């Protein structure tokens, strides 16, 4: 049996094998302050019927397949956005930012190169996005085009932090079906504190940038972050509403 293809196995881990020591952002960091300020959005994601039905092991496989294929559109756009971002970063002035953005881009490429074959698709253009998924990817692309590079990483925090977080919340609740068909998916997103290290890398870089550059606009960053969070909520809210599932 071939290895199951998941986000976590391909692009969610930004750490090379020999670099596992990642400090957790401080409690007063932008990373945690903005998350807990808007934790109501995260909790709404947890409570979506898609994830709750999935947790019970009863989600129609049609819906799972539809969202997985739809999510690939986001992943292909993310790879393109991050490659364009590299052109905006001065590698000598901001080596850490460049390195992280480059690793993120490479990880998306790794996932994307496997996805088409795994799901028997001819090309990435075969995927027709919903308006929400298109707008989500466009939001991150626009941030890359019109804002300083650090804000693009802010836009990607929900992608890297929310997924392990909501998986942890769901797995620790009563009613979670450990023998369900989707147990591997939740375990692929949350496997202890290591699940959060990639998001922490982004958070620590933002904290360092904020301390050194003194040009980090928290109000702007929060607006970008919340917009990404709301797109995540919309994606999961709509995920079991498309005709074709039972």
Where are these regions (language model features)?
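Active-site-proximal alpha-helical scaffolds that flank and shape metal-associated catalytic sites
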Residues: 25, 69, 93-197, 226, ...
């Amino acid at each position: 049996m071939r290895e199951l293809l998941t986000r976590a196995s391909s692009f969610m881990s930004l750490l090379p094998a020999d670099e596992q020591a990642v400090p957790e952002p401080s409690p007063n960091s932008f990373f945690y302050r903005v998350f807990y300020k808007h934790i109501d959005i995260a909790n709404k994601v947890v409570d979506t019927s898609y994830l709750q039905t999935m947790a019970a092991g009863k989600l129609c496989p049609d819906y799972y397949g539809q969202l997985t294929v739809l999510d690939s559109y986001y992943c292909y756009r993310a790879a393109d956005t991050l490659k364009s971002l590299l052109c905006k970063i001065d590698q000598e002035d901001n080596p850490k930012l460049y390195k992280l953005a480059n690793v993120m881009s490479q990880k998306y490429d790794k996932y994307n190169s496997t996805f088409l074959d795994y799901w028997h698709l001819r090309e990435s253009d075969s995927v027709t996005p919903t308006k929400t998924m298109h707008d989500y990817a466009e939001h991150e692309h626009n941030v890359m085009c019109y804002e300083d590079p650090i804000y693009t990483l802010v836009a990607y925090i929900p992608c890297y932090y929310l997924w392990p977080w909501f998986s942890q919340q769901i797995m620790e609740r009563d009613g979670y079906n450990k023998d369900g068909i989707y147990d591997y998916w939740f375990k692929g997103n949350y496997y202890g504190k290591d699940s959060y290290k990639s998001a922490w890398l982004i958070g620590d870089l933002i904290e360092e940038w904020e301390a050194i550059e003194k040009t980090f606009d928290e109000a702007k960053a929060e607006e970008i972050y919340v917009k990404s969070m709301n797109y995540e909520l919309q994606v999961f809210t709509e995920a079991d509403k498309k005709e074709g599932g039972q």
